[in-house]
Each structure stands twice: as C-alpha cells, then as structure tokens.
C-alpha cells in the first residue's frame, strides 16, 4: 500500500510517498514559496534531487505539481495516481476534540475548523492542503494525524493553568503540547529497540530541534509535556523564548513601544538561542562561534542545555523515576555537546555517559554506559513514517 504524506505550511509543503509494506520512501520533496514564485524539489529514491521553478499561486497548484512529478515518465516513482492508496495529512492542532488520528470526513473537517483559534498560523494551511488533495484525488481515503493528539492523555493537574477556570470552560485555554507524532513514535521505538515493555516503563523524550519540546511518557501514555496552549511555552528554542515571566510582555511593550502583536513577534521569531547569541538559531553556527570565543554563543548553548536538564528533572519527579531518556530531532540527534551538557546535570540519577558513543552519529544508539542506572539513547525521529502508519491503521 502506498501512502502520500503531506505536511502543509502557509507557504510551503513537504511530502513523502511511502510504501507501507516495506516502509521504504519511494519519493520525497518540498514545495516552497507557494503564493509567490514557487519552487518544487523532487527526489525519487536512489536518484539526485530535481529542482523546478514553477508558479504555485495556491496549495492546489503545488499539490498538482507534486502529483505530476510522482507519475513523470522518466523520474516518477509510480506509473499512475491509482497507485496512491491513501493520503496522510499532518494537522497541527486538534484541541480536545481529537485524542487520536481520524479519517477525514466533512464532519471531521468542521471540527478541525473549530480549532482554528488555537492555531491560527497553522490550521488554515493544513485545511487548504486537505481540500486541495480532495479536489485532485477524489475517492482516495485520507487521514488527519494531529500534533496534539498524543498529549491528550495528560491528567488535569498537568494541563490546567493557574488562570480563572472560566477561561478553560469558555475558550479551552489549557496545555495541549505539540510534536506529539514524534514523541509517540520515539517512545514506542525506543522501548522496542531496548526490548522494554512500553506498558511498564518511564520514558522521557527530548525532541530538540528549532522547535523543541519534552514529554514524560508513563506506561506508553503522555502525562506531561513542555509546550502549552501554543508551541511558545517550555524550552528555550531556536527563535522562541520558551518560559518567561509573563510580566515581561508588558515591560517590553512599554520600553519598546510595541503592541501585543509586536511583542509576540519578538517572543516567537527574535528570541531563543538566536536572541541570546545575536548570531544564529542554528547550533552548528553556535558551536563554531563558541569555539571561536564568542561568549554569547556559548551562553546560548548553556541556557538551552540547562533548561532541557531542568525539564527532564521535573519529569523524573512527575513519574517518580525514569528508565529511559531519548534524544531526538535535529539538535537531539546531531549535537553531542548539547547531550553532554544536559546529562552532566543529571548525574544524581546515576547516569554515566559513554563519551565515545555520544560522539557517534547514526541510527538508534545507546550513549549511556552498561552500568548507568538510566539508559540514554539517541533515536532519529520519523514523523512521516509515523503518519503513514497511522493512516494505514485507519484506512485498512
């Protein structure tokens, strides 16, 4: 069975065609600058990337270009669109309505639209992608996989904020969490990799990318996570502030003469390690800067690592222990220095690190020593494969 996985942003679209029987990626790519001038990147398995400049006024034209590339006579991955058996869509926010993935129906889409307020930057783009696929691929079953769904098992004590309860009742203001597809995939995969029973386990997943979040997974269920109503809460990130004193918003607004949108723009796009360093949101640049003696780059790495360690410590308390810590995503998988700094704070848990293993790159690595009281792993995430698996499970 072939599943087309679609991840729509406001001006970009990522896609993969996955054979669910072998879990092989048949083709993948990216549409960029939708609504501007348009660029399609397409790569069939085993071949070089092809980049085509092409107008994409809307998401529908972008998806049409993807479908045309998939069946191209020379470089297509399939002979005809009849070989696409299902489509899996990433949907950022499912609110409280969706605790799991769902087959896309008119009723389901209406329920997703009701969550628009919770993710105004993402949900409209997700819906545009879904509707474009429905128009271009009528009759093909489609599934929505929600970033928030995995975290819907959190207890009330973890998701309620210390705000007037009526805001929760009226507006559903609460912690939702994000990156759920990744947290779910990695927690299941690390248990399998280590031969552990996930239903009798305490796992902390650190999804550290430009957007970063941590989750506490007790017996296979999420009991807490660092992102909140929006992806702005929690860890210090690439350009997002993470947790701050809320009164800073008023303070900065007055000092800098900004309105609420201006302050939110600073917190979302000009803060995090980029804001601290004044250099970059990319950890490769920060490491180079630190090695060259840039004190602010060094400070950014320290602040980031310290916040990760603090969250891990709090989730050890939330679960009354931990068996496994799994690092994943761009920084989690590729920045040994960050893992090393984070784990240095966690010696009290009886963690000992195999520095040689920590320096390696590759699939599924244990980086703790055999006598470490907590097993620490690096597990590459694969959100597209997770979406394909969810899609197959519902369509079959």
Labelled PLM ranges:
Residues 1-4:
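Extreme N-terminal starter segment of soluble prokaryotic enzymes
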Residues 9, 89-92, 208, 322, ...:
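Glycine-rich beta-strand-to-loop/alpha-helix junction loops that act as flexible
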Residues 12-56, 228:
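Short glycine-rich, Thr/Ser-proximal phosphate-binding strand/loop in the N-terminal lobe
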Residues 70-122, 143, 149-158:
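Short beta-strand-loop/turn "lid" adjacent to the catalytic site in phosphate-handling enzymes
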Residues 150-254:
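Glycine-rich phosphate-binding loop of actin/hexokinase-like ATP-binding domains
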Residues 218, 224-259, 265, 329-360:
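Catalytic phosphate/nucleotide-handling subdomain of diverse soluble enzymes
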Residues 265, 272-276, 283-318:
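Adenine-nucleotide phosphate-binding core of ATP-dependent small-molecule kinases
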Residues 298, 302-323, 332-396:
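Internal helix-turn-beta structural module
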């Amino acid at each position: 069975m072939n599943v087309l996985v679609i991840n729509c942003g406001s001006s970009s679209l990522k896609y993969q065609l996955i054979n669910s029987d072998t879990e092989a990626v048949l083709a993948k790519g990216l549409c960029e600058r939708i609504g501007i001038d348009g660029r399609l990147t397409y790569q069939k398995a085993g071949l070089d990337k092809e980049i085509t400049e092409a107008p994409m006024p809307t998401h529908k034209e972008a998806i049409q270009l993807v479908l045309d590339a998939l069946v191209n006579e020379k470089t297509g991955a399939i002979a005809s669109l009849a070989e696409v058996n299902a489509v899996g869509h990433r949907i950022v926010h499912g609110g409280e309505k969706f605790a799991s993935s769902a087959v896309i129906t008119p009723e389901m889409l209406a329920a997703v639209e009701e969550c628009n307020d919770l993710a105004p930057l993402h949900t409209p783009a997700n819906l545009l992608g879904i509707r474009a696929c429905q128009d271009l691929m009528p009759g093909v079953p489609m599934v929505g996989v929600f970033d928030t769904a995995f975290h819907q098992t959190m207890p009330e004590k973890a998701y309620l904020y210390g705000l007037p309860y009526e805001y929760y009742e009226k507006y559903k203001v609460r912690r939702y969490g994000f990156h759920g597809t990744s947290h779910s995939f990695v927690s299941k995969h690390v248990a399998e990799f280590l031969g552990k029973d996930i239903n009798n386990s305490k796992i902390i997943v650190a999804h550290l990318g430009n957007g970063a979040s941590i989750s506490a997974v007790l017996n296979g269920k999420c009991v807490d996570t660092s992102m909140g109503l929006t992806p702005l809460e929690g860890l210090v990130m690439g350009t997002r502030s993470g947790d701050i004193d809320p009164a800073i918003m008023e303070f900065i607004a007055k000092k800098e003469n900004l309105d609420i949108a201006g302050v939110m723009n600073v917190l979302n796009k000009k803060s995090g390690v980029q804001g601290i360093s004044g250099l970059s949101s990319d950890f490769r640049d920060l490491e180079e800067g630190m090695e060259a003696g840039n004190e602010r780059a060094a400070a950014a790495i320290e602040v980031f690592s310290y916040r990760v360690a603090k969250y891990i410590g709090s989730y050890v308390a939330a679960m009354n222990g931990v068996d496994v810590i799994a690092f994943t995503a761009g920084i989690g998988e590729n920045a040994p220095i960050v893992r090393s700094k984070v784990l240095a704070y966690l010696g009290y848990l009886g963690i000992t690190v195999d520095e040689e293993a920590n320096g390696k790159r590759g699939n599924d690595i244990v980086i703790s020593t055999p006598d470490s009281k907590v097993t620490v792993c690096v597990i590459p995430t694969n959100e597209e494969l997770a979406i394909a698996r969810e899609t197959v499970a519902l369509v079959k």
